[in-house]
Design a protein with these regions (language model features):
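N-terminal secretory signal peptides that target proteins for export/translocation
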Residues: 1-5
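Basic side chains
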Residues: 6-7, 89, 126
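Sec-dependent N-terminal signal peptides
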Residues: 6-18
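Small/flexible residues
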Residues: 8-9, 23, 87
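Hydrophobic core
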Residues: 16-26
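Cell wall/extracellular polymer interaction/catalysis modules
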Residues: 26-97, 105, 111-115, 120
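Exported/periplasmic cell-wall-interacting domains
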Residues: 40-42, 77, 81, 93-181
Length: 181
């Protein structure tokens, strides 16, 4: 009986440890590739975004290429998590609000220098020259030096322009984008 209880406790502890490991963001040196779907190009490149840390890490053949703080979706318009692939690239790209004037989500027309689309519905990884703050807390109400009070993006992933130029020229159509909570 004692051995049975001991085995049961050990299995429970192992299950808890596995659940905790699966829920955590990957360490900077680890890359988790999608096993079910390989892109046709960009196979050795992956962009990993941590929403909780508001950070982006781009890897080339397992080596860190570039990292940067980002701004992601506000609580009521969150950035979706999951595995995606870049399927369109634009330079420049003009964003026009799909929401009418007067909507709490309306925004004035803006142009990004570099934009890469990764999900239907207008989800892009792009620079945001109008934004002055990137990093932890950028996806909740905060004081932005260029925008004033800001709640985060409308679901896109924003980066500083200089960094986005490098990512844009490095990434190819098909590059994997992994977005973690």
């Amino acid at each position: 009986m004692f051995n049975t209880m001991r085995k049961f406790c050990l299995l429970g502890m192992l299950a808890l440890l596995l659940a905790l490991l699966l829920a955590a963001d990957p360490p900077l040196s680890a890359i988790s590739y999608a096993s079910s779907s390989k892109p046709s190009t960009g196979q050795n490149k992956i962009i990993v975004v941590s929403i909780s840390q508001e950070e982006l890490y781009a890897y080339d053949n397992g080596q860190l290429f570039i990292s940067t703080p980002v701004a992601t979706g506000r609580p009521d318009l969150p950035t979706p998590t999951g595995i995606y692939h870049i399927f369109n690239k634009y330079s420049p790209y003009t964003f026009i609000s799909p929401w009418p004037v007067g909507s709490p989500y309306y925004y004035a027309t803006v142009t990004a220098n570099y934009a890469m689309e990764w999900a239907q519905g207008g989800y892009f990884l792009h620079d945001a020259p109008w934004r002055g703050y990137f990093g932890k807390g950028a996806n909740n109400w905060h004081k932005d030096p260029l925008m004033g009070e800001d709640p985060g993006t409308h679901g896109c992933i924003n980066t500083p322009t200089a960094v986005m130029a490098q990512i844009y020229h490095w990434a190819t159509i098909g590059t994997t984008l992994q977005i973690n909570a």
